[in-house]
């Protein structure tokens, strides 16, 4: 559930409508235009002998198909965040899961969540853990793995790089 957005989709920067668009193919073209090769498994291969171009050709810059404004990442940064149909369906599934598992053993796993918008993930996880003695809050974060002292008996906080843990 991409409650905070998804780097893999674009939305109109205005936004003039509430649809999002998969950006994988165009991002691959942007990466290739800089000199990389994208392997069949998605691995990026840097050029062996040439320097990276570090620019994207203007014809690859995405524009809204409805109004022509530049497209932007679908990230909850301000009031322009688009909650599309897929977002609402995922939110409904999440709410249903939370409702069906109240009072049961639940792991609230928080991976790399910061304090940009703590009211979306972090604080609700803390509240749901505090309200359920069978719940566990687990936080893995590069530099800021913490929880309120009231949750310390129900929490696991690990600081470190995901790739090394």
Q: Where are each of the predicted segments found?
A:
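Conserved catalytic alpha/beta core of Sir2/sirtuin-type deacylases, generalized to analogous enzyme cores
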Residues: 1-165
